[in-house]
Amino acid sequence: ILKDHGNEVLLLIKTKDVLEKLIQQDGFSFVNIQPKTRKNNPVAILLASFIRTWKVVSIVKKHQIDMLIGTDSSIAQAGYLTRKQAITTLEDDYEVIRKLADLTYPYTKTILVPEVCKVGKWNRKKIGYDGYMKLAYLHPNRFTPDVAVKNAYIQSDRYCLIRLAQLTAHHDAGIRGLNNQLVKNLIHVIENKGYQVFISVEGEIAPELSTYQLKINQNDIHHILAFASLLISDSQSMSVEAAMLGVPSLRFSDFSGRISVLEELEQRYRLTYGVKTNDPDRLIGLTSELLENRDIRSLFQQYRKQMLSDKIDVTAFMVWFIEHYPESVNIMKHNPDYQHQFN
């Protein structure tokens, strides 16, 4: 959209999961500022951050960049070092991503986050919007589930997804998720309810679970998710995506109760359930309970409809915010309801 409006856009990425492959399939040109996956220790994290910042500074100078927008600390730091406008877009609370936030928030000009998101002592830089980052690409104005895409992989209408995350981000340290035995127990419960099971993994799958692995073009994952009866996951991201699509989800994670976006989706809109990793029996029980409800899909679509009525078209809002920056900051600070024209 920004390009269609006559703006020049340079996309920067770092190697993560299947990100590079997805962008290539979408036909976007990009620069990878971290081609190799870093090790998951404090020294490696800091060194990789320094190298990314140095690379972004070089790119800003070479291409005469006017504005930087993104989630990575290198965006904020490079903006600070080159005296360019930098907008940080995130949706995790400060206490959850403290290390990333401490490398980012002091240097960025604006922190653009969902209204419910907490940014610690950096509230003066916060611009909150009534939406979620994942609504930017899963709002009905942006995404329409295609049953034909789903049918190319899965013919049944009665299936559940289990998503296994790698949990390698710096804020994932000490966080546990779904183990193989618990996944086997879940499969037993789900199949006994008459549903098929498909497992989506970020890394390698255990050999004994490989027959359940979902093998698809990753660009099609949201079409598969949209028609699922239930998502069970230790991925916070896919749980939010399921909520955007009105698909019930159970997230098994020690992050449960700690992330404001997911707490709002659970407590206010009833679109997801969080279960701590010390209570696997509750996860099994909720799985059985949800799959016994024959009206579960229509019920959660009603919950989704309520959520969407309260939220904005995040993409339309962000395009306006970027193109009118920094005036857009003053507008949002003095009249936050201005955003509700983007729906």
Summary of predicted features, one role per range:
Residues 3-48:
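Conserved nucleotide-sugar phosphate-binding/catalytic loop shared by glycosyltransferases and other
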Residues 16, 26-39, 81, 167, ...:
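Catalytic donor nucleotide-activated moiety binding site of glycosyltransferases and closely related
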Residues 52-56, 198, 202-238:
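Donor nucleotide-activated moiety binding/catalytic core segment of transferases
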Residues 67-78, 88, 224-261:
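A donor-sugar binding/catalytic signature common to diverse glycosyltransferases
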Residues 87-89, 96-111, 225:
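A conserved, positively charged/aromatic
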Residues 108-177:
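A nucleotide-sugar donor-handling region in carbohydrate enzymes
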Residues 244-301:
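Catalytic binding pocket for nucleotide-activated donors in carbohydrate/polymer assembly enzymes
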Residues 285, 292-343:
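C-terminal amphipathic helix plus adjacent low-complexity
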